[in-house]
């Protein structure tokens, strides 16, 4: 007997912070000789023996102080890579002893960086990682839980018994253990015991995959097994400036875009079938499409309509479908509702193959209170701020990250980098930035704490966002970082080195509210609210804006875009076309939610499909053609995107004709020479002989008309284009005599070839006439 009963009891009761001090192989001196003692704790074993790796000889182990604590003394100074033969009832199994592997994956440098909040690839150290130690393959586990009394690993490999794989705690609060002979596909959890003896079963905060809800275990995954085919895309992205590129985003919720029959499982490339994931108990016959199915169906659909990017509502793992993904428990795990991590990689790869960028909604502002998640992770407020006035959103029922804690900030910053590193995404949209940067966001007086200067700004959260954006653009130039910021926080898209938050785009919430308020009015009243249309131009160049009509505008009894519009059915469709035509010619990148292209009559239903049956009707088919052509116009005309963020990209022709609810303006490309003229009529009253001044003489081709018959409009227009008249108007020497369709937007472009040809023809005529006159 080489060990005390107290030491054995600490192991048996899960109270030892370093089980390696007791278990595994140890050298001892007996009778002047150096020998090896091997100890094992196997709670379900009847007998255990040691198998020598040298001669495969078995050495029976004896129970010591506890019927399930075994030890064996072997007459050899050192014994490595031994195995344990365990008899459990009628079954026997042979395993490598986890406590024979003492080497750690985390170095002191790793731990120092993590403690400082600066380990940018900590997701490759913490979590579960397939590795090889001393020639034996297995999985290395590491989790940060500094205030826990004990942490163990649970899984099928130990019958979910937390006594069998107790972890070792390091001086920084990171617990670790290498478990040999297991690999990809293993489900696991952490069993965390606090100092009061309460036990919590937790998913891995750094886990790469989780089980399909309602199950909550993490899954061991090898993320390096996928072979990417997007090298050309990634290289091109590095040298691209998003500010000068066309960006038209199709915002999509994968779980409600379209469903498939639950009786027709999806096929994997190897011929096997994907597990069927039902949409809900209320729809037992419907299943979610998989990432691979979406890669084929959604990508081709989006490409056909001409969008440049797909933005996914949060794809990180979340337990509640009704949260739309905004209450995340698995920050490093794409949701298993739609397939595996490799399946999601395939989706991104397929997008890039088709020239489509991928944006992911990222939620660093809060997390849910689900017991298996981050909340109260080690028995204390670890990830959330301990002060509820800072650490809880009561109206949302969620917890707020402690942005002043280095390890928490490191968790989130590394998480943002992770999606770009491992999944090759092209951008993130950061959700609810205002809730992060203000202490008093949605909090009444008395329920928030001022910062150290007495203000409402959450300084640590703002600094965290600056850190994240600085890292993103340092590691991944050419990507997008988009803020959903609904207040007037200054310099959101300004560089961090001048005090900005460092995003490269911000949703223009003011434009969205102004335009929806305007279009919901009866057209007769719009003449009194011209400011709704024009106000955004006063500030459009102060930030890099993205115009967004998102999912938030078509839920919670707000009605669909089509349902918001006044008038009869024809006017409703015409209003939708006018709204989006103005949006796509207004400065700013574009985002619109799925279903608006149909458009739907009903609100978005997270458990339903889009109203695809509407495409059986001509009016809805016309709208789909409208959006295809609108995207083509936007992406093919540099004047509509190159100077979105510069004052020089926009000029009013006339913004004061409120009596007719008409506005006209010029959009210019970076060279200043390429331009388009847009005229918007926001009433059902058409106007003939409506005069608009233009900067250059010549023939102006009508390159887009939202009232085209092909879109379901009245087909009123300008017969392909107009020649200018020498009529001074709107401070220009020449002008156009136009026909403005009802609730219509028309876009014109100077046809330089036709204009030059006409000038040359005129000059030739004048030359001939002059020669004839001279001859006479």
Curated annotation (Swiss-Prot):
Record keyword Glycosyltransferase present: yes
UniProt-listed Pfam families: Alpha-amylase, Alpha-amylase_C, CBM_48, GlgB_N
Catalytic activity as recorded in UniProt: Transfers a segment of a (1->4)-alpha-D-glucan chain to a primary hydroxy group in a similar glucan chain
Keyword Glycosyltransferase applies: yes
Pathway named in the protein's UniProt entry: Glycan biosynthesis; glycogen biosynthesis
GO cellular component term, pick one: cytosol
Keywords on record: Carbohydrate metabolism, Glycogen biosynthesis, Glycogen metabolism, Glycosyltransferase, Transferase
GO terms (BP aspect): glycogen biosynthetic process
EC number(s) given by UniProt: 2.4.1.18
GO terms of molecular function: 1,4-alpha-glucan branching enzyme activity; cation binding; hydrolase activity, hydrolyzing O-glycosyl compounds
SMART domains noted in UniProt: Aamy
Active site: 431 (nucleophile), 484 (proton donor)
InterPro entries given in the database record: A-amylase/branching_C (IPR006048), Branching_enzy (IPR037439), GlgB (IPR006407), GlgB_N (IPR054169), GlgB_N_E_set_prok (IPR044143), Glyco_hydro_13_cat_dom (IPR006047), Glyco_hydro_13_N (IPR004193), Glyco_hydro_b (IPR013780)
PANTHER family, alphabetized: 1,4-ALPHA-GLUCAN-BRANCHING ENZYME
Function of the molecule: Catalyzes the formation of the alpha-1,6-glucosidic linkages in glycogen by scission of a 1,4-alpha-linked oligosaccharide from growing alpha-1,4-glucan chains and the subsequent attachment of the oligosaccharide to the alpha-1,6 position.
Similarity-based family: Belongs to the glycosyl hydrolase 13 family. GlgB subfamily.
Subunit organization: Monomer.
HAMAP family registered for this protein in UniProt: GlgB (MF_00685)
Name of the protein in question: 1,4-alpha-glucan branching enzyme GlgB
Classification of source organism: Bacteria, Bacillati, Cyanobacteriota, Cyanophyceae, Oscillatoriophycideae
């Amino acid at each position: 007997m080489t060990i005390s009963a107290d030491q054995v009891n600490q192991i048996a009761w899960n109270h030892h912070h370093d089980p390696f001090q007791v278990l595994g192989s140890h050298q001892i001196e007996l009778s002047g000789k150096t020998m090896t003692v091997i100890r094992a704790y196997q709670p379900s074993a009847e007998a255990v023996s040691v198998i020598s790796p040298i001669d495969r000889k078995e050495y029976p182990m004896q129970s010591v102080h506890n019927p399930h604590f075994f030890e064996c003394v072997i007459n050899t100074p050192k014994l490595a890579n031994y195995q344990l033969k365990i008899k459990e009832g009628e079954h026997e199994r042979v395993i490598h002893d986890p406590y024979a592997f003492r080497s750690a994956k985390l170095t002191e440098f790793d731990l120092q960086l993590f403690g400082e909040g600066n380990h940018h690839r900590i997701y490759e150290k913490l979590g579960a990682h397939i590795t090889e130690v001393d020639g034996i393959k297995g999985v290395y586990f590491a989790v940060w839980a500094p205030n826990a009394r004990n942490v163990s690993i649970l899984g099928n490999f130990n019958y979910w018994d937390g006594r069998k794989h107790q972890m070792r705690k390091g001086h920084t609060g990171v617990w670790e253990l290498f478990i040999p002979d297991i690999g990809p596909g293993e489900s696991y959890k952490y069993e965390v015991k606090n100092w009061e003896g309460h036990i919590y079963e937790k998913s891995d905060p750094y886990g790469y995959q989780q089980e399909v809800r309602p199950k909550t275990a993490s899954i061991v995954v090898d993320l390096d097994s996928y072979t990417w085919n997007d090298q050309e895309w990634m290289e091109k992205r590095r040298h691209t400036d998003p500010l000068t590129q066309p960006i038209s985003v199709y915002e999509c919720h994968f779980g409600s875009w379209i469903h498939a029959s639950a009786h027709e499982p999806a096929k994997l490339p190897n011929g096997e079938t994907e597990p069927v994931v039902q949409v809900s108990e209320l729809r037992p016959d419907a299943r979610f499409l998989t990432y691979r199915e979406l890669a084929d169906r959604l990508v081709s659909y989006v490409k056909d309509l001409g969008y440049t990017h797909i933005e996914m509502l949060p794809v990180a793992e979340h337990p509640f479908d009704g949260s739309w993904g905004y209450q995340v428990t698995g920050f490093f795990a794409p949701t298993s509702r739609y397939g595996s991590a490799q399946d999601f990689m395939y989706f991104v790869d397929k997008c890039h193959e088709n020239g489509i960028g991928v944006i992911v909604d990222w939620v660093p502002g809060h997390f849910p209170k689900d017991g298996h998640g981050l909340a109260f992770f080690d028995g204390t407020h670890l990830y959330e701020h301990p002060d509820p006035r800072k650490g809880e959103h009561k109206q949302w029922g969620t917890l707020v990250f402690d942005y002043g804690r280095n390890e928490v900030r490191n968790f989130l910053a590394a998480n943002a980098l992770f999606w770009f590193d491992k999944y090759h995404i092209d951008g993130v949209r950061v959700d609810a930035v205002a809730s992060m940067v203000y202490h008093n966001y949605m909090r009444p007086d008395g329920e928030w704490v001022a910062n150290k200067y007495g203000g409402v700004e959450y300084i640590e959260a703002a600094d965290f966002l600056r850190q994240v954006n600085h890292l993103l653009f340092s590691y991944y130039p050419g990507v997008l970082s988009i803020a959903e910021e609904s207040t007037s926080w200054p310099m959101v898209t300004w560089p961090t080195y001048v005090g900005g938050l460092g995003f490269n785009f911000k949703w223009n919430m003011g434009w969205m509210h102004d335009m929806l308020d305007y279009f919901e009015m009866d057209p007769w009243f719009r003449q009194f609210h011209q400011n709704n249309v024009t106000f955004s131009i006063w500030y459009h160049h102060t930030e890099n804006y993205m115009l967004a009509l998102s999912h938030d505008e078509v839920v919670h009894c707000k009605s669909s875009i089509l349902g918001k519009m006044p008038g009869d059915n024809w006017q409703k469709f015409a209003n939708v076309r006018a709204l989006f035509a103005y949006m796509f010619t207004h400065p700013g990148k574009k985002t619109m939610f799925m279903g608006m292209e149909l458009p739907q009559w009903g609100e978005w239903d997270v458990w339903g499909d889009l109203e695809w049956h509407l495409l059986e009707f001509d009016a809805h088919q016309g709208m789909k053609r409208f959006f295809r052509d609108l995207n083509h116009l936007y992406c093919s005309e540099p004047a509509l995107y190159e100077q979105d963020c510069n004052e020089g990209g926009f000029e009013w022709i006339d913004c004061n004709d409120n009596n007719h609810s008409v506005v006209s303006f010029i959009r210019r490309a970076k060279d200043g020479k390429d331009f388009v003229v847009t005229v918007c009529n926001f009433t059902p009253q058409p106007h003939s002989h409506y005069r608009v001044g233009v900067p250059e003489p010549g023939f102006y081709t009508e390159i887009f008309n939202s009232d085209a018959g092909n879109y379901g409009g009245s087909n009123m227009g300008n017969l392909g284009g107009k020649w200018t008249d020498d009529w001074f108007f709107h401070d220009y020497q020449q002008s156009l005599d136009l026909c403005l369709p009802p609730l219509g937007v028309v876009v014109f472009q100077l046809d330089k070839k036709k204009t030059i040809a006409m000038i040359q023809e005129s000059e030739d005529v004048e030359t001939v006439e002059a020669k004839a006159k001279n001859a006479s």
